[in-house]
Amino acid sequence: MSTMHLLTFALLFSCSFARAACDPKIVNIGAVLSTRKHEQMFREAVNQANKRHGSWKIQLNATSVTHKPNAIQMALSVCEDLISSQVYAILVSHPPTPNDHFTPTPVSYTAGFYRIPVLGLTTRMSIYSDKSIHLSFLRTVPPYSHQSSVWFEMMRVYNWNHIILLVSDDHEGRAAQKRLETLLEERESKAEKVLQFDPGTKNVTALLMEARELEARVIILSASEDDAATVYRAAAMLNMTGSGYVWLVGEREISGNALRYAPDGIIGLQLINGKNESAHISDAVGVVAQAVHELLEKENITDPPRGCVGNTNIWKTGPLFKRVLMSSKYADGVTGRVEFNEDGDRKFANYSIMNLQNRKLVQVGIYNGTHVIPNDRKIIWPGGETEKPRGYQMSTRLKIVTIHQEPFVYVKPTMSDGTCKEEFTVNGDPVKKVICTGPNDTSPGSPRHTVPQCCYGFCIDLLIKLARTMNFTYEVHLVADGKFGTQERVNNSNKKEWNGMMGELLSGQADMIVAPLTINNERAQYIEFSKPFKYQGLTILVKKEIPRSTLDSFMQPFQSTLWLLVGLSVHVVAVMLYLLDRFSPFGRFKVNSEEEEEDALTLSSAMWFSWGVLLNSGIGEGAPRSFSARILGMVWAGFAMIIVASYTANLAAFLVLDRPEERITGINDPRLRNPSDKFIYATVKQSSVDIYFRRQVELSTMYRHMEKHNYESAAEAIQAVRDNKLHAFIWDSAVLEFEASQKCDLVTTGELFFRSGFGIGMRKDSPWKQNVSLSILKSHENGFMEDLDKTWVRYQECDSRSNAPATLTFENMAGVFMLVAGGIVAGIFLIFIEIAYKRHKDARRKQMQLAFAAVNVWRKNLQDRKSGRAEPDPKKKATFRAITSTLASSFKRRRSSKDTSTGGGRGALQNQKDTVLPRRAIEREEGQLQLCSRHRES
């Protein structure tokens, strides 16, 4: 027993010298509460926390004050009554006076300066989520903007895709708008319209009239009590609170003055335990107690500041304690599970879904933090309806956007009276045209003005069919920028927006896209596509290589080298035949001894034989006689047969079976896969084809080449192909096949790739999407789409060469006719030469005959003189003179003609030499006769 007394005495003695080691650490927690009653509740909650944790190391101590009438007094009270007590955290609630939302502000500012955490109990204004202003503020209730999550969940449950967001242009309204738009983006949707009004405004009629013109009938309102009352009064005057409408509001909008004017059937929210200050006091104390025990287990913990006077040092452990608080998870709270997000706001909160019925709020469902659980049987909708409204009004006037893309949409100017010219299809039916407004870009370089034009084609016929089937009217306009639609960066930022028809649809400028818009994944993420009205793929357009028939077309079967060898062979064989027959002892022979010997084969005859065998013209005469020459002739005949047969076969292939070869084989052609500047191919900028090549990694090399050469429109690219500025154009097969059928110098090549389809584009929340798809499916079934295809796409103006046998034309055989004409001209030219030569030869022969006759007379005269006859015979003398006279005149004419034609050149001298001997003989004869006559006279 004495031993126990000694131990007890030793323990008490040691504690008297080391009290700090034995006494628990006192942790002060401050609070600014609305009433004395809540201060008592705060102290009880602290005592309960001490008992719950039961730690002898730490003891929580409650220090509290009530709200002061103004901000200065409140800040002084925080400094003098709370911070001076070295509080680790401060709890703050709202004062009992309504609409005093700024009372927590002096507490937040004062404590935040020293980095002392502040826990709001009933403060729901979104401004306290801004940590650049309220550095150390946390709260056990969510902000009003958190109600956007409940609205979004109700939209999902009731499948409401058309909404109008009506918000006040203040911090609370903007916060609610931002949160809801973020949630809608995750769902790939958006509000049909966001309408803002200034806080405190007394007239929102114009704003509500704008909302009434929209399709959406679900109106989400975020405003203060007074502003909400103003909106309700204006909506009632415009009959916007009756059947068909849905009003979703928050807690403020069904409180106080707003509730007096709220229409029956409105759906509002109330935070469960949102105004239960005692419950939030208990939960806040539990969170702080849990965080304090976790904090004090760490090292280097400093004490909070003591007072504000002369103290400007922040609490170094304050930021750490705030992080510990924000990471706390208090599962046993009176108000439910308590957790904080990165802004210090409560993550999970439960709401009651309230329905105003006969001026009383009735709970018709709950929101458990993640899902809405409604009780549809208890809900009374606006107008006393018990059935859920569909949330939209089917507008019967739609704005249609399209694009100029033949044959789907043709665009032509209107006539002078503003109407469209009447035209007929290939079937004889009148072309259905509609007035469409769009930019007038017919004059390059001039400013683009929006003017009425005439639109018709495949898509216009389809639009007319849909409008008649689904009972709506429309107004058509052409897309302003001429693009189908792709995403592009805004001002070099990371934000991307759609341009073209996609941009107009998403921005609300159009309700529907009726155009050859390709269905792809990128677009389908943002808009809703109908069932395809036209299936197609991608193909390649090139300029057709039309064979040009030249005058030497008949020579195409053989190359130039082969023609030269054939021509050389003809003459070599002719010479060899002549030589063999010439030197053969049997080249000339007689049938019997009485007959004369036959003439040998001449070179001319050998040439005729060689050409005759080659051209199969028949040999009448001049055949070789010797055996050796005839052997060569037979070999030459065989050679000629093979050459002629080969030529005939190739001539048929070139002239009859000729087809233009495709320049490229398809998407895997080496000239496409390995691009070069010598072969240019492209597509349309910011189109689905452009997106396809950009997304495909294996086509990245092709895309880099195409990107530099892409065109603004398909029409420009097609014209570039025709002008040889572009070698290949990659685009939708339906369009390119039509262009190739209309423009005979173009042809598509290769197999289809990236198969897809054309669809009608609508917004995700469009009420028409299901009906449009059903109508298109019915049009496929009843053959209407097939008729449109035949009328607009399959109509061909160019003859299909593959369906008709190829025939020879004059162009193919013009060279042969020119060869015959050349032969005729050559024959005529040669006949004149032959005639001239013959005349020349006859004249010369006559001269020689006269010369020989004169010589004979001269000889006779000489013989007569030698025989002793003194007087010549007068007849012979007369004959001699006649001959000499004729020769002289002949020589003079010949000399004059030669001198004239040759200019006294070498030709005349040569001709004179040819007749010098006869002329000299005659001159000598004349001289002798004159001497004889003078001698006789003497």
UniProtKB/Swiss-Prot annotation:
Topological domain ranges for the Extracellular compartment: 19-559, 648-812
Keywords: Calcium, Cell membrane, Disulfide bond, Glycoprotein, Ion channel, Ion transport, Ligand-gated ion channel, Magnesium, Membrane, Metal-binding, Phosphoprotein, Postsynaptic cell membrane, Receptor, Signal, Synapse, Transmembrane, Transmembrane helix, Transport, Zinc
Sites where a glycan is attached: 61, 203, 239, 276, 300, 350, 368, 440, 471, 491, 674, 771
Pfam family, one: Lig_chan-Glu_bd
Region feature (Pore-forming): 603-624
Positions bound to glycine: 516, 518, 523, 688, 732
UniProt record, GO biological process: adult locomotory behavior; associative learning; calcium ion homeostasis; calcium ion transmembrane import into cytosol; calcium ion transmembrane transport; calcium ion transport; cellular response to glycine; cellular response to manganese ion
Notes on activation and inhibition: NMDA glutamate receptor activity is potentiated by Zn2(+) in a dose-dependent fashion. The potentiating effect of Zn2(+) is at submicromolar concentrations and its inhibitory action is at high micromolar to millimolar concentrations. Excitatory glycine receptors are inhibited by D-serine at 100uM.
Gene3D superfamilies: 1.10.287.70, 3.40.50.2300, Periplasmic binding protein-like II
SUPFAM superfamilies documented for this protein: Periplasmic binding protein-like I, Periplasmic binding protein-like II, Voltage-gated potassium channels
Assembly: Heterotetramer; the NMDAR subunits are modular and harbor tiered domains that function in concert to regulate opening and closing of the cation-selective ion channel pore. Forms heterotetrameric channels composed of two GluN1/zeta subunits (GRIN1), and two identical GluN2/epsilon subunits (GRIN2A, GRIN2B, GRIN2C or GRIN2D) or GluN3 subunits (GRIN3A or GRIN3B) (in vitro). Can also form heterotetrameric channels that contain at least two GluN1 subunits and at least two different GluN2 subunits (or a combination of one GluN2 and one GluN3 subunits) (in vitro).
Described purpose of this protein according to its UniProt entry: Component of N-methyl-D-aspartate (NMDA) receptors (NMDARs) that function as heterotetrameric, ligand-gated cation channels with high calcium permeability and voltage-dependent block by Mg(2+). NMDARs participate in synaptic plasticity for learning and memory formation by contributing to the long-term potentiation (LTP). Channel activation requires binding of the neurotransmitter L-glutamate to the GluN2 subunit, glycine or D-serine binding to the GluN1 subunit, plus membrane depolarization to eliminate channel inhibition by Mg(2+).
Domain notes: A hydrophobic region that gives rise to the prediction of a transmembrane span does not cross the membrane, but is part of a discontinuously helical region that dips into the membrane and is probably part of the pore and of the selectivity filter. The extracellular N-terminal domain (ATD) is a site of allosteric regulation to modulate overall receptor function.
Family recorded in the similarity comment: Belongs to the glutamate-gated ion channel (TC 1.A.10.1) family. NR1/GRIN1 subfamily.
Protein known as: Glutamate receptor ionotropic, NMDA 1
Lineage, highest ranks first: Eukaryota, Metazoa, Chordata, Craniata, Vertebrata
Gene: Grin1
